[in-house]
Regions:
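Contiguous, glycine/small-aliphatic-enriched amphipathic segments in soluble metabolic enzymes
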Residues: 1-131, 174-219
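A broad detector of the eukaryotic-type serine/threonine protein kinase catalytic domain
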Residues: 7, 140, 160-163, 169, ...
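FAD-binding core/adjacent interface of flavoenzyme oxidoreductases
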Residues: 136-149
Length: 219
């Protein structure tokens, strides 16, 4: 999506990519073969070097993944052929860390992340369960959650990337109240003056007075 321009809304912002030029050049060649989209890649070492030209992707080059690390032939692309690797995990983690640093320093106004392989970043010895936890750690945020947004609907999680069994164990009154407060503040921050917040029950019919579970009663 990035190399085909679908993830670069130039009518609303001036986008640049934090990543590796070698990987983006490979992806651009593969995209041209697959879909005919011809995108150029420009390496930059500072945000101030970005030119934001149509048809060109400014890539803040991290220099982690080299051309020799990409064995696939762009004429016969196999974008998912490598699977999860420690190198891929290290690269992905460093990209996310860098965009956080750029945002915290005021060099960029907002960040957007692509899908992240949790398996890969853990293979690289970065023990996080997802973007949310990385952002929280590097921004020193103690109370946080994930919000999914689509038009008029916002969905906010009491738990994030954990097993279903652990998710049930995390449904505690204090945590639910924290998430409600975070959701309220988050909605207001994006322009919803009076958020209407519905809280889902853990059990069917919110436990039906204990018939299907007592969490709603005891918590």
């Amino acid at each position: 999506d990035v190399v085909q321009g679908r993830s670069l809304p130039r009518d609303r912002c001036r986008p640049l990519v934090v990543g590796d030029v070698s990987a983006m050049e490979y992806a651009a060649k593969a995209a041209k073969v697959v879909s005919g989209v011809d995108m150029k890649v420009r390496a930059i070492k500072a945000v101030s070097e970005a030119k934001y030209e149509y048809g060109v992707i400014d890539v803040y080059d991290m220099g982690i993944v080299k051309a020799a690390d990409i064995p696939n032939d762009p004429e016969h692309p196999k974008p998912f052929g490598l699977g999860a690797t420690a190198l891929g995990g290290e690269a992905a983690f460093q990209y996310v860390k860098k965009v956080i640093e750029l945002a915290m320093s005021g060099e960029v106004d907002a960040t957007i992340t692509n899908a992240l392989s949790k398996e890969a970043i853990n293979m690289a010895d970065h023990h996080y369960s997802g973007h949310t936890e990385i952002y929280a750690d590097y921004t020193k945020t103690s109370k946080y959650t994930m919000m999914l947004a689509h038009e008029e609907l916002r969905v906010v999680h009491v738990s994030t990337h954990v097993s279903l069994r652990e998710a049930c164990d995390r449904v505690k009154k204090d945590r639910v109240l924290d998430v409600i407060r975070i959701a309220n503040a988050g909605c207001k921050a994006i322009g919803i003056k009076e958020p209407k917040i519905a809280v889902g029950g853990l059990n069917p019919h919110c436990g039906e007075n204990g018939m299907f579970g007592r969490e709603e009663i005891e918590e």
